Amino acid sequence: MEHVNEILATVGVILQQTQTTQDVNASAKLGAYIGAGVTMIAGSTVGIGQGYIFGKAVEAIARNPEVEKQVFKLIFIGSAVSESTAIYGLLISFILIFVAGA
């Protein structure tokens, strides 16, 4: 009977350690998914900023049509630079979901 109790105690300890490991893995996945969601804020803020910038560019061209080429050149360069922030955020969220969350 003592051997049965020892075996049951050993199995209980193993199951408890397995459960703790599963909890840690679940917490790591949860943290990765929350981090991925937070990084996507970068994409939304870039969209808001680009909308504001393009609106102001249209206003500038409406006031002074002669500067259309200059404004569009600056707008496209600025748009590409600001879009890189959203792309980096998307890349980080993919890494968090598919690498850290796996």
Swiss-Prot record:
The record marks E83 as: Reversibly protonated during proton transport. One of its GO terms (biological process) is proton motive force-driven ATP synthesis. One of its GO terms (cellular component) is plasma membrane. The chain crosses the membrane at residues 34-54, 80-100. It comes from the Bacteria. F-type ATPases have 2 components, F(1) - the catalytic core - and F(0) - the membrane proton channel. F(1) has five subunits: alpha(3), beta(3), gamma(1), delta(1), epsilon(1). F(0) has three main subunits: a(1), b(2) and c(10-14). The alpha and beta chains form an alternating ring which encloses part of the gamma chain. F(1) is attached to F(0) by a central stalk formed by the gamma and epsilon chains, while a peripheral stalk is formed by the delta and b chains. This is ATP synthase subunit c.
